[in-house]
């Protein structure tokens, strides 16, 4: 759904999105209150970073646990995976600029120029490399790639074994 930032904030703060939140996180009152505030805070952080962007989409990408075949997917193997109730959320605004700006809570902003999708060695091991790689692969496949601004926050901790990078991949393909 596309709403303006003020509409999203009101919808979450007032509880109008509780039916959607309960599908993702369960319907315990304390959990819903925590998630409402989490989304409101993320929208506020986005609008502070990108005040010129008003029309927003919101995405959730779950972490996952690999029940069998852990890490074999990297070599085109099979994995039995299950989503967990921890996720990464992204507040996103699309635009025609040829740049992706992604700011994750507690990390520096990544900026990827979509007019240059070649490998940048300085980005190795950083989120920008994942973003650039996904955009490059889409371009190779003939998919039109355009810019967006995004703010993300995650309850999937880096290094937790719950595929925090995979959650970032899912958010980056929005």
Q: What are the residue ranges of the model-derived segments?
A:
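N-terminal amphipathic, basic-rich helices that act as targeting or association modules
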Residues: 52-73
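Short Gly/aromatic-enriched secondary-structure transition segments
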Residues: 76-83
